[in-house]
C-alpha cells in the first residue's frame, strides 16, 4: 500500500470517527430527553394512582339503587 493510499484510509477513518461521535452525542441527547420525560410521567402516574386510592367511594352511587338507563 502506498503512502497516499494510507493517508486516504486514515482520512476516511477520521471522517467516520467524527460522524460516529456526532451520532453518539445526538443519541445521548435524545436518551437524556426521554429519561426526563419518563421520570415526569412516572411522577404523574404516582400522583394519579394516589388520587384514585384516596377517592371517597361513599360519594359514588350504589348501582343497585340507580335507575336503569333509558335503553332498558
Swiss-Prot record:
Superkingdom of this protein's organism: Bacteria
InterPro entries listed in its UniProt record: SlyX
Gene3D superfamilies: 1.20.5.300
Family: Belongs to the SlyX family.
Protein name: Protein SlyX homolog
